[in-house]
Regions:
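Metal-coordinating catalytic core of metallo-dependent amide/deamination hydrolases
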Residues: 2-126, 131
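Non-catalytic positions within long, well-ordered alpha-helices that form the structural scaffold/packing
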Residues: 1, 56-57, 150, 187
């Protein structure tokens, strides 16, 4: 399978998705194309977000979002809740780019886990990409978060080369501290 993240925003034409799903069907015998609507999480609290989720329900699209600190925890939780409820309603998967940061370690995953717990939803397939700021937490904190993630069946995709390029980079020196998801610790927690 090839998963592609398509930048998505309010007011964007639905036509792009119709064309992408035509391509998906055209090549389905040779290749599985997975499309993620990568949007600000507040997008899923709009009529455009609801309409796109409906279209995705019959085409296998994936709801996507970006959660990177600093952010307003209350608003982020509200928008994540809407996204989770849409995914539950339309039987969709979620793909989040989360904690791709060198500040506020684990802030995004903590809000996600708290929101899932408050909604009492456990059956939504969720993939979290990056999680690079977790490396700044203590080993115990990583293992505790990992256990909660495993309990909710949250999958993690580490993107070390992307994070090496995006985070803590300087034109004058090579940083000795480049955050990357703590995969070994998360694996100990069965993530």
């Amino acid at each position: 399978a090839i998963r592609s993240h398509i930048d998505t925003y309010k007011g964007q034409s639905i036509d792009i998705w119709i064309e992408l799903f035509k391509l998906q069907k055209k090549f389905s015998s040779e290749l599985t194309l997975q499309y993620v609507a990568l949007a600000p999480v507040e997008f899923w609290d709009t009529t455009d977000g609801e309409d796109l989720a409906k279209i995705f329900s019959s085409n296998g699209g994936i709801l996507g979002g970006v959660i990177v600190p600093p952010f307003n925890k209350k608003n982020t939780s509200k928008f994540l809740a809407k996204m989770l409820l849409l995914a539950s309603k339309y039987k969709l998967e979620i793909d989040l780019h989360i904690d791709e940061s060198i500040i506020e370690p684990g802030a995004g995953i903590k809000v996600l886990l708290e929101t899932i717990e408050n909604l009492k939803i456990n059956s939504i397939p969720i993939t979290c990409s990056h999680l690079s700021s977790l490396i700044s937490l203590s080993n115990r904190e990583i293992l505790n978060l990992g256990e909660k993630m495993a309990e909710k069946n949250i999958k993690v995709i580490a993107l070390p080369l992307t994070n090496f390029w995006l985070l803590n980079r300087s034109n004058k020196t090579t940083s000795l501290k480049r955050p990357v998801a703590p995969i070994k610790q998360l694996q100990k927690s069965h993530v």
